[in-house]
């Protein structure tokens, strides 16, 4: 279903018969994990962890070090940790590690202010573009395979930086938050017109079945999207289906691959298949300021 970042709070629901696996829930998913991958937390730990003041990682593949400069954990954009103190050039954070009895204990972790910030980061177009630039080109990984992101984990991590919580599944992200706009009954031209007229750059999600995209603005009258995509569906003259692999986070129009001779016109066009838009504008903010 989904990978879970390091130091994510979980609830253990059940152990397998051999006690090697645990069925766990997080705030956004559930599934089985090896018991060696988590540590139990007592009430005192929980009280300390729920500090109410948090830091968020803003640079992918960031190493968090202890006070001696030794490696503790690796984190990426959107990963959240309790914030202890802001120093001149570093943030001091709480990091959970397991002791010999598999109990969670707290260590100090340090990370450069270039790689982490107090959560939430102020939303504006400059900050939004910076976070997108950190993610662009990152490999595609369905469900977090090999530690990479798929389309919905990319959008989820992106918005976490700005304090906007999203569900994990692409359809839920569009239907369970913000202002939902149904595009399913419109022609491709009408869809793009609505997106250009009503979409808020970096605050609007576009959705087709199985794929979610972030609207980021327009160029030459065409909508631009930022998304992590596996590939474009193709079909040759013999009717054989395939994929033109992209396999990373990219910026495209709503018709990537339209120049391909063998693009599957029915299933391969994002614009033709977009069914909805969701505008995630917070109540106290009409549009992001530069």
Predicted regions and their residues:
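Glycine-rich catalytic cores of cysteine/serine-nucleophile enzymes that process amide/ester linkages
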Residues: 41, 62-63, 67-108, 138-149, ...
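Terminal peptide-recognition signature
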Residues: 24, 154, 213
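Structural motif
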Residues: 8, 79, 201-204
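Boundary regions of SH3-family modules and the immediately adjacent low-complexity/disordered segments
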Residues: 1-20, 25-64, 71, 77, ...
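...with weaker cross-activation on analogous glycine-rich loops/strands in unrelated enzymes
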Residues: 3, 167-236
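N-terminal capping segments
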Residues: 82-185, 209, 226, 278-288
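Short, glycine/acidic-rich beta->alpha junctions
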Residues: 2-5, 16, 73, 150, ...
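Aromatic- and glycine-rich peptidoglycan recognition patches
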Residues: 28-31, 36-56, 62-65, 215-290
